[in-house]
Swiss-Prot record:
The reaction(s) this protein catalyses: a primary alcohol + NAD(+) = an aldehyde + NADH + H(+); a secondary alcohol + NAD(+) = a ketone + NADH + H(+)
A GO CC annotation given for this chain: cytoplasm
Sample GO molecular function, one term: alcohol dehydrogenase (NAD+) activity
Keyword Secreted set for record: no
The name this protein goes by in its record: Alcohol dehydrogenase
The enzyme's E.C. designation: 1.1.1.1
Keyword Hydrolase found: no
């Protein structure tokens, strides 16, 4: 099993899907779970620690929109304490097409910067041991919710980035895969803004269709982590875990 005995960093591990997944990860017995999030939640950290006292759960304040140099600085602190990190989960995300710059900064640039920052410690060309990255993207990276085109585009960009660097694993020693949840019943989807208010009732319309619980999503998330398949595009929708076969329409040839 991949999770057991490992050191894991979970960016945004206290959110809706994030906290539920953190619970499932802790139950699977990692050595350390390090949660990076924008807001402290001591009660949640205590709950996670109590779920499995053999796991050390720690917390650091972190905003994915900080300069990459700040991320490297924080990672140096974590690596100095734990010596090794086996898995980085990038889970930060917002859904609000009124906030164009922040949506891109959190959903795409933040994922890129955090992934790039940890390469300083993992890249085998620098003598690093390699590692694994799991990036939470979205099914909107496959087909957009057209009323929130900024959100959908940011997730498509994160998916493209993830799939690209997975192909560099033989060079960097770092394997990568994407986690793409379908509509999950969290606070994120209950109230959000469409682009230019083209659909004021977008949340209500979206929730009129079947959704999945955050627990169902989290359980499948852990299954994907345990599968540990480089380049996998995982769809986590309506309680199912499916690997997506990406259709190639063009190839650079290099």
């Amino acid at each position: 099993m991949f999770i057991a005995g490992k050191n894991i960093i979970f960016v945004a591990g206290l959110g809706g899907i994030g906290l539920e997944t953190s619970r499932e990860i802790v139950k699977s017995g990692p050595k350390n779970l390090v949660i990076l999030d924008r807001a402290p939640n001591p009660a949640a950290i205590a709950e996670l620690q109590a779920l499995n006292p053999k796991v050390t759960v720690s917390f650091y304040l972190y905003d994915v929109t900080v300069p990459q140099s700040e991320t490297v600085k924080l990672l140096k602190t974590i690596f100095a304490k734990l010596k090794t990190i086996d898995l980085l989960i990038n889970g930060a995300g917002i859904l609000d097409d009124h906030q164009i710059e922040r949506t891109i900064a959190v959903n795409f640039t933040g994922t890129v910067n955090t992934t790039t920052a940890i390469m300083e410690f993992w890249d085998k060309r620098k003598g690093g041991p390699g590692g694994v990255v799991a990036n939470i993207c979205s099914v909107t990276g496959f087909n957009s919710i057209y009323q929130v085109p900024v959100y959908s585009a940011s997730k498509a960009a994160a998916l493209s980035f993830t799939s690209s660097i997975a192909k560099l694993a033989t060079i960097t020693g770092v394997t990568v895969y994407s986690i793409n949840p379908g509509i999950t019943d969290t606070t994120l989807v209950h109230k959000f803004n469409s682009w230019l208010d083209v659909e004021p009732h977008v949340a209500e319309k979206l929730l009129a269709f079947p959704t999945q619980t955050s627990l169902a999503c989290a359980k499948n998330f852990v299954k994907a982590i345990e599968a540990n398949k480089n380049g996998a595009i995982w769809k986590l929708d309506l309680g199912r875990l499916d690997e997506i076969e990406w259709t190639k329409h063009w190839d650079s040839g290099i």
